[in-house]
C-alpha cells in the first residue's frame, strides 16, 4: 500500500518527535533511524512513555481530527458547506454527495500511522521491561492496554467509515515486510477489536494521580475502554453487552461524583446536584436566571467531570492548537468556517418548526447554533467558549443570548471530545430499546417491552431536562413515545440534539441503516438538507455500499489486494458506478 513507507517513516519520526520534547540524547540526529528503533532507543520506561505520548500527539493533528469530523458529521443532515467552501473542491463534493476515490478525505494514512505506532510499542515494550527494573509488570500491562485501546479506536473509526479495511496487529519496522494486505470484513475486525479490549480492560489505568490534571480524561482509562466496548457492542447488535458496559461507565462516573460531593460537604449547591440520579452537569445557574453552565464546562473549559476521553489542547499559544475546528467551524476572523449549520436546523427554533428541537426552551439550540442573520447560521459549539442565555428577558429569542468571542484563528484551544457521559447514556438507551421484542402481542411481551422503554425514556428525559430552561414542566411525555418505532426515533433524535457537531451523527445513521438492512431512514433525514445537497441524495444513497467511503485511488493502485467499494468508481470519471442495488 501507499501508506507503507509513510507508516514506517511516521513511526520513526514519531519517536524522534517524542524525544525532542523530552530532551533525548543527540545520537538521534546521527544514527540511522532503523538502528534507533531496533537497538538504542528502547532501553527504559521513559522511552516507551515518549512513544505513547507521540500516539496522542498524532491524534491531535489537523488531518486526524479533520477526518473524525468529516467522516462522522459532514455527510449527515446536521451541516452544509460554509464560507468559501466552493474553493475547497473535496470538501464541497462531500456536501454535494459527489464523493469519489480521488477525494483527499478518503486518505487514511494518518490513522494507520497511529496504529503502527501502537503496534511498535506493543512490539518493543516487553523487552524494555526486561531491561528496566523500574518498569514493573503492572506498568507494562497498563501500557499495553493503553496503546491497544488507541489502536482499536483508530480501527473503529476506519471500519465505520470504509466498512472493510486492512487489519494487522504487527508492527511494520522495515520496507521488507509485506504491506499489501486485503481488506478484512467489518464484522471480523469488530470482533477482533472487542476481543482485544476485553482482554486488556482490567490492566488499564483506572485513576491517574490527581497531580496529573489532564491525564484522567486526556489518556485512555478503564472508563474509556468501557465506553468503546459499549459502542462496539451497539454496532455488533449485542445489546445486552452494550448495556452492561454502558452501566460500568455510568456507575463509575456516579461513584466519582459522590466522592467529589463528599469532599465538598456543606458547600454543595443546587448546580452540583445530580439530575434524576445521573451525575450530569446542570446547565442552569443556581437561581435559574441564566443558562449555559454545562456548555461552558464541557466545551469551553473542557476536561469536565462528564468527559471520558478527549483530545486536549492546552490553553497556551505556544502549544499545538485545534486547527481542524478553527478551519471547519470558524474562528475570530472567519465565522462560519467552511462548514455551517444546515438551514433547516438553523431556522428550526426561530420559525417555530421544531422538527429537530422540541421547543425554544431547549438550550442546546442556542448553544450549538449561532444566528448571524435570518438565513445564515454558524456552528457555535467548539468555536466559541461560552454562551449566556438570559432568562430574565421578557421572551427567549436571539437577543436574550450572548456569546463570548470565538477562538483566535491560529490559537483554537477547544478540546475534541471522543466520549462523554451523555453519549454513553444514550448508547444504553438505544440498546434498551433494541432489546424490546418486535412482537408485543401478548400481555407479558407488552410488559417486558414497556419496562425497557421506560428505562430508556428515563435516560433521555434526564438529558433533555438538563437543557430545558422553561419555567414550566421540564418533563417529556412518555405516552407519546411508547412504541418501538417511536422510541427508536426518540433516541436517535436526542442523540442528534445532544451530540450535534461532535462527529457522531453520520455514524448513528449508518448504524441505523445496518440494523434496518436498508438506507430508507438515512435518506429521509439527510434529504432535509434540501438544495444544499439533499435533493441528489436519494438516488445516490439508495444502496448500502454508498453509505461508506471509497478507498483512495492511490491505495487501489499500489495495493492490488484491495477491491474498491462497488458504489464508487476509480475517481477519475464518475463518483458512482451506474449499477443497480
What is each residue range found by the language model?
Residues 1-33, 441:
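Bacterial Sec-dependent N-terminal signal peptides
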Residues 25-88, 165, 190, 196-204, ...:
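An aromatic- and glycine-enriched ligand-binding surface/loop that stacks and positions planar moieties
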Amino acid at each position: 500500500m501507499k501508506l507503507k513507507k509513510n507508516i514506517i517513516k511516521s513511526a520513526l519520526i514519531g519517536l524522534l518527535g517524542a524525544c525532542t520534547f523530552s530532551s533525548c540524547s543527540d545520537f538521534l540526529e546521527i544514527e540511522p533511524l532503523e538502528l534507533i528503533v531496533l537497538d538504542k532507543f528502547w532501553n527504559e520506561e521513559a522511552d516507551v512513555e515518549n512513544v505513547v505520548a507521540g500516539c496522542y500527539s498524532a491524534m491531535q493533528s489537523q488531518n486526524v481530527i479533520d477526518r473524525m469530523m468529516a467522516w462522522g458529521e459532514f455527510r449527515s443532515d446536521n451541516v452544509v458547506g460554509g464560507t468559501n467552501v466552493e474553493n475547497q473542491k473535496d470538501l464541497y463534493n462531500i456536501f454535494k454527495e459527489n464523493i469519489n476515490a480521488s477525494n483527499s478525505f478518503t486518505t487514511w494514512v494518518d490513522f494507520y500511522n497511529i496504529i503502527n505506532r501502537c503496534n511498535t510499542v506493543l512490539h518493543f515494550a516487553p523487552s524494555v521491561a526486561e531491561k528496566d527494573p523500574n518498569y514493573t509488570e503492572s506498568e507494562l500491562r497498563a501500557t499495553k492496554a493503553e496503546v491497544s485501546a488507541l489502536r482499536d479506536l483508530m480501527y473503529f473509526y476506519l471500519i465505520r467509515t470504509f466498512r472493510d479495511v486492512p487489519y494487522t496487529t504487527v508492527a511494520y519496522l522495515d520496507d521488507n515486510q509485506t504491506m499489501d494486505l486485503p481488506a478484512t470484513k467489518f464484522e471480523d475486525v469488530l470482533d477482533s477489536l472487542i476481543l482485544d479490549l476485553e482482554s486488556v480492560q482490567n490492566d488499564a489505568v483506572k485513576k491517574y494521580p490527581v497531580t496529573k490534571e489532564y491525564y484522567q480524561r486526556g489518556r485512555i482509562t478503564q472508563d474509556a475502554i468501557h465506553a468503546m466496548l459499549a459502542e462496539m457492542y451497539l454496532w455488533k447488535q449485542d445489546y445486552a453487552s452494550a448495556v452492561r458496559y454502558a452501566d460500568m461507565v455510568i456507575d463509575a462516573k456516579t461513584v466519582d461524583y459522590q466522592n467529589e460531593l463528599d469532599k465538598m460537604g456543606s458547600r454543595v449547591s443546587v448546580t452540583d446536584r445530580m439530575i434524576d440520579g445521573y451525575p450530569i452537569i446542570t446547565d442552569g445557574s443556581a437561581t435559574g436566571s441564566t443558562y449555559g453552565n454545562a456548555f461552558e464546562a464541557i466545551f469551553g473549559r473542557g476536561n469536565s467531570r462528564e468527559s471520558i476521553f478527549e483530545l486536549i489542547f492546552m490553553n497556551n499559544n505556544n502549544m499545538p492548537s485545534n486547527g481542524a475546528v478553527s478551519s471547519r467551524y470558524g474562528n475570530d476572523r472567519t465565522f462560519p468556517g467552511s462548514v455551517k449549520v444546515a438551514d433547516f436546523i438553523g431556522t428550526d427554533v426561530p420559525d417555530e418548526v421544531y422538527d429537530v428541537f422540541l421547543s425554544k426552551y431547549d438550550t442546546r439550540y442556542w448553544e450549538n447554533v449561532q444566528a448571524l442573520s435570518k438565513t445564515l447560521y454558524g456552528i457555535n459549539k467548539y468555536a466559541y467558549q461560552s454562551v449566556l442565555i438570559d432568562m430574565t428577558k421578557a421572551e427567549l429569542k436571539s437577543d436574550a443570548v450572548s456569546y463570548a468571542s470565538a477562538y483566535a484563528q491560529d490559537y483554537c484551544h477547544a478540546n475534541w471530545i471522543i466520549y462523554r457521559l451523555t453519549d454513553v447514556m444514550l448508547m444504553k438507551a438505544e440498546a434498551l430499546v433494541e432489546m424490546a421484542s418486535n412482537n408485543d402481542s401478548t400481555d407479558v411481551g407488552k410488559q417486558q417491552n414497556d419496562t425497557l422503554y421506560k428505562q430508556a425514556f428515563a435516560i433521555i428525559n434526564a438529558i433533555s431536562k438538563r437543557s430545558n430552561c422553561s419555567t414550566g414542566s421540564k418533563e417529556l411525555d412518555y405516552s407519546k413515545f411508547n412504541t418501538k418505532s417511536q422510541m427508536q426515533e426518540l433516541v436517535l433524535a436526542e442523540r442528534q440534539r445532544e451530540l450535534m457537531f461532535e462527529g457522531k451523527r453520520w455514524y448513528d445513521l449508518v448504524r441505523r441503516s445496518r440494523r434496518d438492512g436498508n438506507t430508507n431512514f438515512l435518506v429521509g433525514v439527510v434529504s432535509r438538507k434540501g438544495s444544499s445537497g439533499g435533493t441528489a441524495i436519494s438516488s445516490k444513497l439508495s444502496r448500502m455500499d454508498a453509505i461508506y467511503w471509497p478507498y483512495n485511488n492511490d491505495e487501489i493502485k499500489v495495493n492490488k489486494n484491495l477491491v474498491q467499494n462497488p458504489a464508487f468508481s476509480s475517481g477519475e470519471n464518475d463518483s458512482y458506478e451506474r449499477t443497480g442495488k
